């Protein structure tokens, strides 16, 4: 099953116990998947979804939480439609539901972003908002260079509100416009896993992480297999050895590390087989390989000095024979 379908299937079956979270999820789903229409002088709400289980979930919550009936139409694939779509329509009580969910403000005007009670609420409501947005218009690509969790938004105001909801979950998301369409995107692998966990898609998160790890292992194996030059092999071993020393240095120094040295050390740990030049390019802002090497040397020097003062093993204590055989 594709990752997008797997996440949506799991979220569509996730039980949500609090009424506030269910209300927020419905509000955001209607905002992202639907629209307000005037039919014979009455407001009608429609939401177009790509899964029968999502449509059933939304229909059930509208009835249980807001007390309104709805109609479900199935639009079969054909012509320009590549997949079957499910259209949920609330006609009889459309205006009442629009006001209850915050699609209309107190004066009966359409809300361009998300309702204020969602924008300024708790982390639990932020999770519900993201869950509703993903169920409505979300996608998740396979792990790789272009991996992304993305939500297509109905406008820039809604996109910025979703970015704010991610910030309340301590996650960094970016709003961007591509060919006139507003989107919110997460590209960092750890952030994607964290968001899937917060939303309740635990099985999908484990599958995504497994595929991500498999790809990283395969990429590392391919990289090593292509090391035709012995100097590159020695450089890789030296980088791994430096990573082991840096790990010991961070243990020794604890919190007593200047920020610029800590950044260099973390880069070395996160990219253990990267060259110094590659590490410099990964730094923010980028720096030369000599600058990154100098910072790592100073970090190791500080740690070894402290180890001598304390009479304990220094940064070279974690090196193995394979690492030293350069």
From Swiss-Prot:
Biological process per Gene Ontology, one example term: regulation of sporulation
UniProt cross-references to Pfam families, sorted A to Z: HTH_WhiA (PF02650), LAGLIDADG_WhiA (PF14527), WhiA_N (PF10298)
Ranges of the DNA-binding region feature: 275-308
Keywords recorded for this protein, A-Z: Cell cycle, Cell division, DNA-binding
A molecular function GO annotation: DNA binding
Domain of life, source organism: Bacteria
Protein function: Involved in cell division and chromosome segregation.
Family from the record: Belongs to the WhiA family.
Name of the protein this chain belongs to: Probable cell division protein WhiA
Source organism (scientific name): Kineococcus radiotolerans (strain ATCC BAA-149 / DSM 14245 / SRS30216)
């Amino acid at each position: 099953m594709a990752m997008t379908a797997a996440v949506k299937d799991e979220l569509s079956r996730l039980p949500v116990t609090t009424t506030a979270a269910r209300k927020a999820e419905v509000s955001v789903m209607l905002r992202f998947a639907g629209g307000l229409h005037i039919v014979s002088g009455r407001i009608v709400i429609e939401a177009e979804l790509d899964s029968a289980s999502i449509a059933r979930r939304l229909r059930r919550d509208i009835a249980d939480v807001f007390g309104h009936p709805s109609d479900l139409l199935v639009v079969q694939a054909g012509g320009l439609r590549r997949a079957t779509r499910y259209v949920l329509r609330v006609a009889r009580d459309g205006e009442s539901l629009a006001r209850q969910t915050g699609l209309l403000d107190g004066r009966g005007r359409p809300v361009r972003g998300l309702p204020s009670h969602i924008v300024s609420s708790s982390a639990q409501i932020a999770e519900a908002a993201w869950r509703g947005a993903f169920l409505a218009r979300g996608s998740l690509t396979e792990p790789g260079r272009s991996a992304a969790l993305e939500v297509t938004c109905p406008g820039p105001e809604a996109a910025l509100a979703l970015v704010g909801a991610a910030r309340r979950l301590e996650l960094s998301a970016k709003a961007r416009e591509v060919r006139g369409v507003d989107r919110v995107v997460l590209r960092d692998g750890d952030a994607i896993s964290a968001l899937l966990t917060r939303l309740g898609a635990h099985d999908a998160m484990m599958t995504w992480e497994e595929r991500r790890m498999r790809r990283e292992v395969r990429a590392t194996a391919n990289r090593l297999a292509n090391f035709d030059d012995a100097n590159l092999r020695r450089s890789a071993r030296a980088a791994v050895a430096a990573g082991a020393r840096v790990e010991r240095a961070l243990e020794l120094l604890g919190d007593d590390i200047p920020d610029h040295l800590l950044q260099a050390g973390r880069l070395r740990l996160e990219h253990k087989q990267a060259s110094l030049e590659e590490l410099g390019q990964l730094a923010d802002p980028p720096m030369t390989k000599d600058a990154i090497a100098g910072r790592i040397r100073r970090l190791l020097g500080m740690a070894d000095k402290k180890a001598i003062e304390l009479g304990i093993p220094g940064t070279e204590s974690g090196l193995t024979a394979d690492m030293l055989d350069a």
